[in-house]
């Protein structure tokens, strides 16, 4: 429910064993919690406590973690609303054709159940929370929901039925898996989901806890989607680095593509085009060259021709300024670390942080220089 600053001060300084510390604690409290503590919700608090409950140490409370897990609860709520309000959802009887994405998310959920139950048997509630968070945010929300959009937009009836069934069934099972950690939001959402999967029970608490399905693992689908994800992320990074709008279609060229990945590409070209906003996808011969921006995915080279997408001179001028900026930062830190007086007096943690910053700037400089060379070659 949160707490006002006045009530928080009273709690932290009232009935103290060492009243002489009251003023110091009050000052620190006013500085850290200017407006008190806002309401974050019971589920977010429970999830935070579970995530911090690793073995053999005291909990070092972090309000940022609480805020992050409140956002996680919001993410789950919004994802559920996206599923349940999808006007193209089709749960009718008929032929179904599961896509590689449908198979992948079901396999990933099965692995999540395995991880969760293993952690629970060892009372590692932190690992339970991490398993739920990783699957919900990084797999289900960030990827699977996006992978279903091309199906609902352009898929046939059998594919749409398969995606619809997968969405609601995985969501329902996920709510059951997460219920021990975040009982209130999962109950609330489950009451809306249960009708979609034909359940008539009164409460999620009366449902069986998810079990690992021995035949529920699909390594082939996992490998295909993981490779496609790497390619999609690489193309998106090229867009971001070259300031190309997400709505503009690109051509994507592959070089040194393995036979295994070539088969994946052949099967999943349509999905890749939709997810990465590509106009054309082509595999080049090993010695064939093109003036393009390149990224590596494994041993394969991804080439994106940039002619017509950017103003070459303006982009080179922009990158030149960036290079100068990073060079100046690297030089500034080098000068600081070469100053014997600074090194002798500065705390070890400060020196370590400066070295980390130096490494970050050096890495950034090298990446920008690579971009410069690629644009210069166009």
Curated annotation (Swiss-Prot):
Classification lineage: Bacteria, Pseudomonadati, Pseudomonadota, Gammaproteobacteria, Pasteurellales
Cited function: Catalyzes the attachment of valine to tRNA(Val). As ValRS can inadvertently accommodate and process structurally similar amino acids such as threonine, to avoid such errors, it has a 'posttransfer' editing activity that hydrolyzes mischarged Thr-tRNA(Val) in a tRNA-dependent manner.
UniProt-listed GO biological process terms: valyl-tRNA aminoacylation
Entry remark concerning the domains of this protein: ValRS has two distinct active sites: one for aminoacylation and one for editing. The misactivated threonine is translocated from the active site to the editing site.
Presence of keyword Chloroplast: no
Complexes and interactors: Monomer.
Gene that this sequence comes from: valS
Protein name: Valine--tRNA ligase
Keyword check for Iron: no
Family: Belongs to the class-I aminoacyl-tRNA synthetase family. ValS type 1 subfamily.
Key words of the record: Aminoacyl-tRNA synthetase, ATP-binding, Coiled coil, Cytoplasm, Ligase, Nucleotide-binding, Protein biosynthesis
Naturally occurring in which organism (per UniProt): Haemophilus parainfluenzae
Disulphide linkage map: none
